[in-house]
């Protein structure tokens, strides 16, 4: 495992960590039972197979 050669200051650590940003998942249109729904791409197959409840909002 990599070990830092020198101690990193708190401000440097926090400014480095602040660069990590969460992104919203892109929604894809899927037609189930004649109705259009928007679901994340990773849930597309489950939505088509009826494994998830799409009417719950």
From Swiss-Prot:
Q: What InterPro entries does this protein map onto?
A: Ribosomal_bL32, Ribosomal_zn-bd
Gene Ontology MF terms in the entry:
structural constituent of ribosome
Q: Keyword annotations for this protein? A: Ribonucleoprotein, Ribosomal protein
Give the matching NCBIfam families: rpmF_bact
Q: Which gene encodes it?
A: rpmF
Protein's recorded name: Large ribosomal subunit protein bL32
GO biological process terms held by the UniProt record:
translation
Region (Disordered) location: 1-21
Higher taxonomy: Bacteria, Bacillati, Actinomycetota, Actinomycetes, Mycobacteriales
The keyword Protein transport is assigned to this record: no
